[in-house]
């Protein structure tokens, strides 16, 4: 599987709303496989299709916390609870981190690679990863939500 080029801040695809996947084809599955390979190669915990230049609503996530690899097509957050603040970074914004407020718990629904609807209740780091990757599908980068860089308010 080829490792895909990760698009960096400034690339217009990162600021565009991704299009829903209307049919899961061999090409879709190949893209997912290549995204997974790219995420692991880059030592990331999540990757959205726009980050590899494809304007489709697909994310892959593996936080390394034991839940394993999660692949979602057309994911959406259907419920949130609580709030917390945590430092984030992004493969598309290399060398930058910042504190971002996000929901501490989320319920996400989407399709798995077989086209079956799944719902995942997540909290902590996994909830944060889902929110971060789904933001990418809406043209939003974590830097748009940063509340603190270092100790200075922005």
Swiss-Prot record:
E.C. code: 3.5.1.88
Positions annotated to bind Fe cation: 90, 132, 136
Record's signal peptide: none
Enzyme class: hydrolase
A Gene Ontology BP annotation from the UniProt entry: translation
Alphabetically ordered keywords of this record: Hydrolase, Iron, Metal-binding, Protein biosynthesis
A molecular function (GO) term: metal ion binding
Catalytic-site annotation from UniProt: 133
Domain of life (superkingdom): Bacteria
Cofactors (names): Fe(2+)
InterPro entries assigned to the protein according to its UniProt record, in alphabetical order: Peptide_deformylase (IPR023635), Peptide_deformylase_sf (IPR036821)
Catalytic reactions of this protein: N-terminal N-formyl-L-methionyl-[peptide] + H2O = N-terminal L-methionyl-[peptide] + formate
UniProt-listed Pfam families: Pep_deformylase
UniProt cofactor note: Binds 1 Fe(2+) ion.
HAMAP family assigned to the protein according to its UniProt record, in alphabetical order: Pep_deformylase (MF_00163)
PANTHER family: PEPTIDE DEFORMYLASE
Biological role: Removes the formyl group from the N-terminal Met of newly synthesized proteins. Requires at least a dipeptide for an efficient rate of reaction. N-terminal L-methionine is a prerequisite for activity but the enzyme has broad specificity at other positions.
Family as reported in the entry's similarity comment: Belongs to the polypeptide deformylase family.
UniProt protein name: Peptide deformylase
The organism of origin for this protein: Halothermothrix orenii (strain H 168 / OCM 544 / DSM 9562)
Gene: def
């Amino acid at each position: 599987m080829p490792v895909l080029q990760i698009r960096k801040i400034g690339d217009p695809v990162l600021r565009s709303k991704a299009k829903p996947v209307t049919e899961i084809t061999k090409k879709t599955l190949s893209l997912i496989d290549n995204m997974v390979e790219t995420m692991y190669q880059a030592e990331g915990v999540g990757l959205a299709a726009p980050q590899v230049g494809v304007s489709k609503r697909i994310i892959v996530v593996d936080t390394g916390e034991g839940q394993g690899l999660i692949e979602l097509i057309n994911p959406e957050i259907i419920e949130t609870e609580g709030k917390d603040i945590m430092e984030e970074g992004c493969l598309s914004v290399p060398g930058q981190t910042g504190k971002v407020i996000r929901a501490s718990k989320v319920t996400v629904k989407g399709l798995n690679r077989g086209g079956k609807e799944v719902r995942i209740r997540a909290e902590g780091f996994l909830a944060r990863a889902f929110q971060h990757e789904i933001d990418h599908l809406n043209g939003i980068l974590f830097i748009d939500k940063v509340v603190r860089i270092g100790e200075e308010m922005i």
